[in-house]
């Protein structure tokens, strides 16, 4: 199975999302899935990642070699983001069904409230004073929590402020990420599992 992840900023987000999605694929019984990130076209921000014209371009370019398309964006406290993703999923699924005979699918997910929170969910030694519900609700969770944690770990000078290092650690505790992120990770895993089960 070939999985292509579409991100609003692959430069910073790739190192976080790749290990977590790979761990998710193992959890749903697809350990051999080849998971890659779309780098061409390079999307700049959630507006482009949620634009049908951009998504259609990606589906046309990579549809022949991809079974599962997965767009991951920050929620940023925007309650309408899920509705936009739902609309994108419908358009993409219709496009894939009409263009290809083999089963292909497209899912979208918005991280509450930023992708960095998925990483924090799997990390050990998060300051005990931090309340998880507050981390999940914070619109600027990247600056309010993730960057502070990366600084505590002396990772701000590392590539992408330590996102990759921390994500690799977090992915080893994927069960914890799933448990702490029911609105996004748990939901996405359930959708992927159901789709894989239908394939047989």
Describe the residue ranges of each PLM region.
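C-terminal accessory helical subdomains adjacent to catalytic cores in phosphodiester-
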Residues: 1-3, 12-42, 49-200
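Short hydrophobic beta-strand that contains or immediately precedes a catalytic carboxylate
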Residues: 5-7
């Amino acid at each position: 199975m070939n999985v292509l992840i579409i991100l609003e900023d692959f430069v910073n987000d790739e190192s976080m999302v790749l290990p977590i999605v790979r761990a998710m694929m193992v959890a749903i019984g697809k350990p051999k899935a080849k998971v890659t990130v779309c780098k061409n076209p390079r999307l700049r921000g959630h507006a482009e990642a949620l634009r049908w014209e951009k998504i259609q371009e990606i589906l046309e370019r990579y549809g022949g070699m991809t079974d599962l398309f997965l767009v991951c964006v920050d929620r940023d406290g925007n309650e309408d983001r899920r509705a936009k993703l739902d609309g994108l999923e419908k358009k993409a699924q219709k496009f894939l069904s009409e263009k290809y005979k083999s089963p292909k699918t497209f899912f979208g997910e918005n991280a509450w409230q930023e992708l960095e929170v998925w990483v924090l969910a799997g990390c050990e030694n998060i300051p005990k004073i931090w309340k998880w519900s507050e981390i999940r609700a914070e619109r600027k969770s990247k600056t309010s929590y993730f960057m502070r944690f990366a600084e505590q770990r002396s990772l701000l000078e590392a590539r992408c402020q330590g996102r990759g290092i921390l994500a690799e650690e977090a992915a080893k505790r994927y069960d914890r990420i799933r448990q702490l992120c029911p609105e996004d990770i748990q939901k996405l895993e359930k959708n992927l599992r159901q789709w894989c089960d239908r394939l047989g």
